[in-house]
Amino acid sequence: MQTEQQRAVTRLCIQCGLFLLQHGAESALVDELSSRLGRALGMDSVESSISSNAIVLTTIKDGQCLTSTRKNHDRGINMHVVTEVQHIVILAEHHLLDYKGVEKRFSQIQPLRYPRWLVALMVGLSCACFCKLNNGGWDGAVITFFASTTAMYIRQLLAQRHLHPQINFCLTAFAATTISGLLLQLPTFSNTPTIAMAASVLLLVPGFPLINAVADMFKGHINTGLARWAIASLLTLATCVGVVMALTIWGLRGWV
């Protein structure tokens, strides 16, 4: 019976870590919460090894070890899932949930998804505000809003069809630069600063992965940090390729 319980707790601990890693948590948090959950559910110790595409976790109880491995598939950044997992771990630490209760709560976790139109609208507004704050004027803000909102919607459609992220970023950057650049060619916007073109692709800056990459490397998770840095760099490169393609094909004036 004790072995069966340890096996169940091991599955829950690695599921906890997998939830966090799949939805954008830093490696230190993945390690900490999976260990805390195991100890809260009666394990003597929990050891884990985290990489960008897998987790290996071992629980130790009365000298008996059980090890489990799970592959990691990126499911996109979603802090709602991360906070839900944190809440469940805290409940287990306060003995408000046993391992069966934790298993039930884990099965009920669903990523929070906002409507596409709302996400595209808010992204457009944020990019337009950046343009206005950087002396782009109201006319530049209007161009940025239209270009970035359309580009974000295109990005969502491509992601829904499971297009490779690098190709997705490249095509989205191409669309955003094309829309903003062609609008700047109109006589109405002849005096509009070209910062509008740069601001329209801000939605593609991989800020969260870069922050997590630096945090991982500072906290000793070098391999995971370098992997995240490489992925973010490839996304940035794909964005640059898309921008240069649009500038070259349409003969648009540059950002300066």
Swiss-Prot record:
Keyword tRNA processing carried by entry: no
Pfam family, one: ThrE
Lipid bilayer topology: Multi-pass membrane protein
Transmembrane segments: 114-135, 141-158, 169-189, 195-215, 229-249
GO biological process, one term: succinate transport
Gene Ontology CC terms: plasma membrane
Topological domain spans for side Periplasmic: 136-140, 190-194, 250-256
Main localization category: membrane
Intervals, Cytoplasmic compartment: 1-113, 159-168, 216-228
Induction: Has 2 promoters, 1 of which is repressed by H-NS. Activated by LeuO. A monocistronic operon.
Cellular localization per UniProt: Cell inner membrane
One term of GO molecular function: transmembrane transporter activity
Classification via InterPro entries: ThrE-like_N, ThrE_Dicarb/AminoAcid_Exp
Record keywords, A-Z: Cell inner membrane, Cell membrane, Membrane, Transmembrane, Transmembrane helix, Transport
Traits of the deletion mutant: Deletion of yjjPB decreases succinate production in E.coli by 70% under anaerobic conditions.
PANTHER family, A to Z: SUCCINATE TRANSPORTER SUBUNIT YJJP-RELATED, UPF0442 PROTEIN YJJB-RELATED
Function field: Involved in succinate export with YjjB. Both proteins are required for export. Contributes to succinate production under both aerobic and anaerobic conditions.
Family designation: Belongs to the ThrE exporter (TC 2.A.79) family.
Protein name per UniProt: Probable succinate transporter subunit YjjP
Gene (UniProt): yjjP
